[in-house]
Amino acid sequence: MHPGLHSQLRPNKLAFVSDDGEQQTTYRQLDEQSNQTAHFLSSLGLKHRDGIAILLDNDLRFLTIAWAAQRSGLYFTPISTFFQAAEVNYILENCEARVLFTKQSILDQTNLTLPPQLTVVTLDRGPSLSWGTAISDFPITPQADAREGAEMIYSSGTTGLPKGVRFDLPLSPGGTVSDL
């Protein structure tokens, strides 16, 4: 079921809880923060079919960011923190991400060569744009031009480098019912 619908029907119900119980988010929080993040992505000039990358460890904010991309008509590429710097660099370049969401602590531990056109948004501290600060002034309501997005995953690459798998996105607004 759509998180926005859960937000209306059971706003205070927990949507996600981390395995240690320290991170929790309700459906209302997920919906509102993903809406704010969607507006933020739009403010950066991202348009339908553009891409973002998410390089995070197990963090519930991944879900909020992924949902924001999903409701903004964007591709989102999850990148494992277990990858070597060369693999991360390759995926960032290949998926044509315009924004990278990560933590400064992850950047400090890796030796990434970030593409110059990439906007880095950190979820903790650091010189990059801070996610919490960046989204705080944006509305918690959905975007008027919401569209469906999708995850762009990478195969294991049996012939060498991993291959990005990008599905076509619908041209209609998000939530549009198709005639069959």
Residue ranges and their predicted role:
Residues D31-Q36, V165-L180:
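Conserved structural elements of the adenylate-forming
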Residues S43-L44, W67, R71-S136, P142-D145:
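Structural core segment of the AMP-binding/adenylate-forming
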Residues I52, A69, L100, S155-T158:
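Conserved S/T- and glycine-rich ATP-binding loop of Class I adenylate-forming
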Residues M1-F16, E32, A150:
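A short N-terminal helical cap/helix-turn-helix that marks the beginning
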Residues A15-D59, W67, Q84-N89:
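Conserved AMP-binding/adenylate-forming core of the ANL superfamily
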Residues P11-N12, N58, S136-S156, G160-L161, ...:
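Conserved pre-ATP/AMP-binding loop-to-beta segment of ANL
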Residues N35-H39, E93, S105, G160:
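Solvent-exposed alpha-helix faces
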